[in-house]
């Protein structure tokens, strides 16, 4: 692992930038936000990410689960002293781990280890009214007012008819004994039942909502999914004041479907789809504070070799579903959207499926290259209190066991260039992010 990460970008082929367009967008913002905010705006690029370091997560069994084969969702507390994490995929249990300071050490063996603070507890079996729709995958965690808000889906909802999405662990400080309250029903269903991130306070008025919820076609049955990363506005009061069985209103800002996907040619048969394929996944979307950008992070694949269904890959692997023809043709990826497009959708001037990212591309992370296939992001979180984005890199720590690998937690601080410099034009293709 070097002391820098290189990020290769594809700037989307959308003719939207230039001084005249930027001035028009800024003029539109003047109506919606305070003048001092407009003066502070810029377009985020991955060049604005400064590596803070990494930590290890112990692989031992704590209570009902362990971090081997971790599902991926996690929630870092504002003071970054601890994080709630979902354990082994088969268990769907939640634990809390104390976090040490992140380290810039270049060897995994030299990284500090998190410590278990609250053991894993299963949650789906503790919902008082049961789980009639068979929700069996945790897809998002959010800490609000001592509660842990949990989004979930049924992994294989063949009928695409599930409406249950959300439940509460009422006292996150007592995972084992807390009451559990659910299910609520997000209006947009699985299109929105993934990440949950706070809108920067100065932008609350833009969408009249305090939170962005989103998801993508990360699991089977595309007919129920947004075929590309979504963004929906959700009000804080509608979340915390809801009762089991209530529908929580959602406002569509970015959303796709089978009829209107983010990208055509999902198997990349033409060899020209470098935006979104059947192998693309999104794990986090958030509005970057101080910018006009909605940033999405996840993984993608098949942009070079194409994607097949139940094929045999070049390394002999027989795939149970979709996969790239070349086994190593997978990568960590990002997509950056202009929130002015989201404003246009909110105002009825644009359709949610017409929104396209202004920049997207491959993201090379520390410790991802260890020979063979790259280690991929399985979860991500953003802490607005410290402007830090966290990535959980799956199966990256192979030192703890000969039989299963643990994830690593990696952190980047967002440090904007020049406090507004660049608001007249989009960022160019980024080249590197220095370790500081």
Regions found by a protein language model. Name each.
Residues 66-80, 126-149, 154-158, 187-212, ...:
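Structural signature of eukaryotic scaffold interfaces centered on beta-propeller domains
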Residues 53-89:
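Beta-strand-rich domains and repeat architectures in extracellular enzymes and scaffolds
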Residues 272-370, 380:
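Loop/turn-rich, solvent-exposed surfaces of beta-rich toroidal or solenoidal domains
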Residues 96-110, 160-183, 224-246, 313-343, ...:
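Beta-propeller blade signature
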Residues 89-90, 154-156, 216-219, 300-302, ...:
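Residue-level signature of beta-propeller blades and closely related beta-rich strand-turn architectures
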Residues 95-140:
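Blade-loop segments of beta-propeller domains
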Residues 376-420:
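Blade-level signature of beta-propeller repeat domains, shared across WD40, Kelch, NHL, RCC1
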Residues 41-66, 353-371:
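A short helix->beta-strand "capping" segment at the edge of beta-propeller domains
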